Each structure stands twice: as C-alpha cells, then as structure tokens.
C-alpha cells in the first residue's frame, strides 16, 4: 500500500517540559536523589544543564561534573535513570507546584479539529513523560511520541519520528511539513538541523534574545491567544501559487 500523508499533510511535534507544563521541583529533586543514591554525591542543576536535553545527557553531564570516570558512566547512567523513574512515579502524583500552562488544552483541541497528526517530542524517557502527562490527562491528545529513551541526542529524534509515523500510520511527511513546538534554543536548533519548522513559546524572559538569535519560524509569548499559531499553520496549508 502506498504511503499517504494525513488529511492535510502536517505533522505537529510538541515538547512537554516548559512548553505544555511546568513540572515543579519534584523531577529535579527525584533526579538529585537518584544520583546521590548511586554516587554518594550531591549535584545541582542550572537551566542550561536541563533545558532541551534528554534525560541520558542530563545524567551524563551530572556525572561528568562529579568527575565520575567516563568508563563507568554508561552503566551508572542506566541505573540512575531507573532509580529516578521509580522515585518520580512515587513523588510526582503528590506534587503541588506542577502547572498546566493556560491555552494548552485549547491548542491540542485545535490540532485535533484540524486533523493534524500530533506527536510528543520529549527528552524524557517514555515512562517519565507518561508520569508527567498523567495528572493533566494529556495522553489522549497524542497518537505516538519520541523520547530520550529512543535516542540521547535530541537532534536525532525527528528522524525517528518520521520512521515511527510511517511504521504506525503508513504516512510520510517531507521535513518542511513537520512543525516542532518547544520553548528552548535547542528545540529551534533541532528543527532547523532536520529541515523542519519551529514554533517557540517564550517561558523565560532571559531566554528571549537567545531564541530570537536562532530565527524560529514563529515566536509566541503564551498559548492563550492561539491566532498567531493558527494563522501560521493555515498558511502552510495553502498550496504554492494558489
């Protein structure tokens, strides 16, 4: 059977942390505890050591800062990730500081109404993403996803997405028919390096200029006003020279 595209030929990939939700302090505390459990050392995380990175690279960076020999990091990384996910599953349901950003549900409903193929693109492991999505009942909006457990390098995730979509739905998308929605410089870079389009929501004022420097296709301050995103996506649906 020949591969097909979705009804209107757009594939939307949306990031989780910082884009749709603010997960609060619990994930960071869970990871810190997991690292301490396996190394006996405490580590702190700044924004640049977390934003846009996959879980395996976040852990590897922490182990490097703790001067753990490179030969030990791979095995230790797997152990820490397993412990982290166990702690996260126990602690996160009780978190009181997690936030679903305004307009996210409306945005996802709009994608559904437009019959866009929508997937999750996240540096979390698949299990970790599920834990974070569940309290907000967001799983229903995603027919598939690609995660840090698929590949440690974020830039490799889009190609995995295209393969997954073909295998699961028998659909093919040209890179310029794929839109990545995120909140960090790395999201924009990931889209550009794969020939895809990018929409960025600014969640931190101190990151605005760095994001602007990467020239995303569109920047929004929040998802409460969906018109800029709707207009941009509708323009993509207009055939050339129409």
Feature locations, PLM:
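Membrane-embedded alpha-helical bundles of multi-pass transporters/translocases
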Residues: 35, 85-86
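Short, acidic loop-to-helix structural element flanking the phosphoryl-transfer center
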Residues: 2, 13, 89-120, 130
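Substrate-recognition "cap/lid" segment bordering the active-site pocket of phosphatases
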Residues: 98, 126-179, 185-194
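Structural recognition of alpha->loop->beta junctions
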Residues: 137-145, 210-229
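Non-catalytic pre-domain segments flanking phosphatase-related domains
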Residues: 1-14, 64-69, 177, 231-232, ...
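Acidic, Mg2+-coordinating phosphoryl-transfer loop and its flanking beta/alpha structural elements
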Residues: 180-218
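Active-site neighborhood of HAD-like aspartate-dependent phosphohydrolases
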Residues: 2-51, 57-60, 64-65, 208
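Conserved phosphate-coupling serine/threonine residues in phosphotransfer and NTP-handling enzymes
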Residues: 122-124
